Swiss-Prot record:
One of its GO terms (molecular function) is structural constituent of ribosome. Keywords: Ribonucleoprotein, Ribosomal protein, RNA-binding, rRNA-binding. It comes from Ectopseudomonas mendocina (strain ymp) (Pseudomonas mendocina). This is Large ribosomal subunit protein uL23. NCBIfam families: PRK05738.1-3, PRK05738.2-4. The lineage of its organism: Bacteria, Pseudomonadati, Pseudomonadota, Gammaproteobacteria, Pseudomonadales. Signal peptide: none annotated. InterPro entries: Nucleotide-bd_a/b_plait_sf (IPR012677), Ribosomal_uL23-like (IPR013025), Ribosomal_uL23/eL15/eS24_sf (IPR012678). The keyword RNA-binding applies.
């Protein structure tokens, strides 16, 4: 997998209360990923970008909510979420380098 595809597959971490609990208690990390990304692509992207060993990848397609605006109905974009489980002894720390 080339470096350009790695950055197109992983769009960024998904920060939420549930994702924080998963990271603290179970060592699982949640990412927003491209809608056409496969589990194997996501695994290779995380392993090459963060130098960790991935045990399991689960994905969910999240449907965008319908929102009411002054001009009628609108819809948020659909997106894909990946939950990354690391092998025991591995840790992913992408929050400490952000300043």
């Amino acid at each position: 997998m080339n470096q350009e595809r790695v950055f197109k597959v992983l769009l960024g971490p998904h920060i939420s209360e549930k994702a924080t609990v998963l990271a603290d208690k179970q060592g699982q990390f949640v990412f927003k990923v491209a809608t056409d990304a496969t589990k194997l692509e996501i695994k290779k992207a995380v392993e090459s970008l963060f130098n960790v060993k991935v045990e399991r990848v689960t994905t969910q397609n999240v449907l965008g909510k319908s929102k009411r605006t002054a001009r009628g109905l609108g819809k948020r974009n659909d997106w894909k979420k990946a939950v990354i489980s690391l092998q025991p002894g591995q840790d992913l720390d992408f929050t400490s380098s952000a300043e």
